[in-house]
């Protein structure tokens, strides 16, 4: 089994803090019943699945800009 590392994910997401937020949101989606975007034959935990999805470029995200009042 190949290990997924933060460095693998940082090739897709430049900011570590953004990576953590993205992975946690994806984990919540998986816990709520979303289907994995990658093959999960090894029955990995949702955290590992979300990181593998990010490293594979399967998870898309958009940064919204907030306007000051």
Swiss-Prot record:
GO terms for molecular function: DNA binding; DNA-directed RNA polymerase activity. Gene3D superfamilies: 3.90.940.10. One of its GO terms (biological process) is DNA-templated transcription. Pfam families: RNA_pol_Rpb6. Keywords: DNA-directed RNA polymerase, Nucleotidyltransferase, Transcription, Transferase. Transmembrane segments: none annotated. One of its GO terms (cellular component) is DNA-directed RNA polymerase complex. Its EC number is 2.7.7.6. Signal peptide: none annotated. It catalyses: RNA(n) + a ribonucleoside 5'-triphosphate = RNA(n+1) + diphosphate. Belongs to the RNA polymerase subunit omega family. Promotes RNA polymerase assembly. Latches the N- and C-terminal regions of the beta' subunit thereby facilitating its interaction with the beta and alpha subunits. PANTHER family: DNA-DIRECTED RNA POLYMERASE SUBUNIT OMEGA. The RNAP catalytic core consists of 2 alpha, 1 beta, 1 beta' and 1 omega subunit. When a sigma factor is associated with the core the holoenzyme is formed, which can initiate transcription. This is DNA-directed RNA polymerase subunit omega. It comes from Geotalea daltonii (strain DSM 22248 / JCM 15807 / FRC-32) (Geobacter daltonii).
């Amino acid at each position: 089994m190949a290990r997924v590392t933060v460095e693998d994910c940082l090739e897709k997401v430049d900011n570590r803090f953004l990576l953590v937020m993205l992975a946690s949101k994806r984990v919540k989606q998986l816990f709520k019943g979303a289907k994995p975007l990658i093959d999960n034959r090894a029955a990995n935990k949702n955290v590992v699945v979300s990181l593998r999805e990010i490293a594979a470029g399967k998870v898309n995200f958009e940064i919204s800009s907030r306007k000051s009042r």
